[in-house]
UniProtKB/Swiss-Prot annotation:
Protein's organism: Photorhabdus laumondii subsp. laumondii (strain DSM 15139 / CIP 105565 / TT01) (Photorhabdus luminescens subsp. laumondii)
Pfam name, any one: Rhomboid
Record-annotated membrane-spanning stretches: 96-116, 144-164, 176-196, 197-217, 225-242, 247-269
Its biological purpose: Rhomboid-type serine protease that catalyzes intramembrane proteolysis.
Signal peptide: none
Entry protein name: Rhomboid protease GlpG
GO BP field: proteolysis
Length: 282
C-alpha cells in the first residue's frame, strides 16, 4: 500500500475516497500518528498516477460539488468514517506481525521462568556473555528477554508492540529482525562496558526502534511508520532522567543511548535517498 496524503478534515477525505471509488480506485483511510490528521492509502499502486492527478484537482477545490455528489452516490453522506480505532484483542493482534508477537510471548515466558526459578538461574543461561562465554552466541541477544520487575516488562512490551508492530507491518519481518539483532548486540555491548554482564531488558532494542521509526517517519512518511513528536520528546526526557538518576531507578542508560544511536544510524542509511533528494532543492 502507498500513502497518498494526510488530510486534517476526515469528511473531506471521505468525500475524496467516495469520488475515487467512482473511478474504480479503492482508497483506505487511517488515523495519523499525530492524531491530528487522517491518511489516505492506495492499495493498487498501478493507479497511483490517476490518484495523483485527481488529488491535484481536489486540493485546489475540495468543496467542488462532484465530491459531494460522489458521497451521495455511495449511499449516504453521513455514513461513518471508514477506519477503526477500537482497542480490542483482535485489533491489537492485527497491528503486530509474527515476529512482534513471538518476541512479546518469549519475554512473558522468560519473565515467568524468572519468577519460579529465580533471576540468577535464568541469567546463567541468557545473560550477556562474560569473558569465557563469548562463543555462546545466543547470549548476545537473549539478554533482551530478561526483565526484573512487572513495570519493567510492561513498559518495554508496550513500546515493542507499538513500534515493532508498525515496523513489521509496513517494512516487513526481515527489517524488524535486522533492527532487533543489530540493536540488541550493539546496546548490550555498550551497557557491558559499564556493568559487565549484570543487566537485562528489551530497552536497548526499544530505543533503537524509537530512533528508527521516528526518523523514518520524519524523512519518509510514505513508508507508513512514525512516532508522534510528543512521544519522542518523552523518550528523550526519560533518557535524561536515567542519566541523572532523578527517581532513584536502576536504569541501563548506556543500553538506551547505544540503542537510540544505532536506530538513528540505521534510519539514516535506509532513508539516505530522501536526504539526497532534499539537498537538490537547496
Amino acid at each position: 500500500m502507498i500513502r497518498v496524503i494526510a488530510i486534517s478534515n476526515p469528511r473531506l477525505a471521505q468525500a475524496f475516497i467516495d469520488y475515487m471509488a467512482t473511478h474504480q480506485v479503492h482508497l483506505t483511510m487511517r488515523p495519523s500518528h499525530d492524531g491530528q490528521h487522517v491518511e489516505l492509502w492506495l492499495e493498487d499502486d498501478t493507479k497511483l498516477t490517476l490518484v495523483q492527478q485527481e488529488l491535484e484537482q481536489f486540493t485546489r477545490d475540495p468543496l467542488n460539488e462532484r465530491y459531494q455528489a460522489a458521497s451521495w452516490q455511495s449511499g449516504d453522506v453521513n455514513h461513518p468514517l471508514k477506519y477503526h480505532n477500537n482497542l480490542n484483542w483482535q485489533y491489537l493482534s492485527r497491528q503486530a506481525g509474527p515476529l512482534t508477537l513471538t518476541i512479546l510471548l518469549l519475554n512473558i515466558v522468560v519473565y515467568l521462568w524468572m519468577q519460579f526459578a529465580g533471576d540468577y538461574q535464568v541469567m546463567s543461561w541468557l545473560a550477556w556473555p562474560n569473558d569465557s562465554q563469548h562463543m555462546e552466541l545466543w547470549r548476545w541477544v537473549t539478554h533482551g528477554l530478561l526483565h526484573f520487575s512487572l513495570l519493567h516488562i510492561i513498559f518495554n512490551l508496550m513500546w515493542w508492540w507499538y513500534l515493532g508492530g508498525q515496523t513489521e507491518k509496513h517494512l516487513g519481518t526481515g527489517k524488524l529482525f535486522v533492527i532487533m539483532i543489530v540493536s540488541a548486540v550493539f546496546s548490550g555491548w555498550g551497557q557491558s562496558l559499564f556493568s559487565g554482564s549484570h543487566f537485562g531488558g528489551l530497552s536497548g532494542v526499544v530505543y533503537a526502534l524509537i530512533g528508527y521509526v521516528w526518523l523514518t517517519g520524519e524523512r519518509a512518511p510514505e513508508r507508513g511508520i512514525g512516532v508522534p513528536r510528543g512521544l519522542m520528546a518523552f523518550s528523550l526526557f526519560w533518557l535524561i532522567v536515567g542519566y541523572f538518576d532523578a527517581f532513584g531507578l536502576s536504569i541501563a542508560n548506556a543500553a538506551h543511548f547505544s540503542g537510540l544511536i544505532i536506530g538513528l544510524l540505521m534510519a539514516l542509511w535506509d532513508n539516505r535517498h530522501t536526504f539526497k533528494n532534499n539537498n537538490r532543492h537547496f
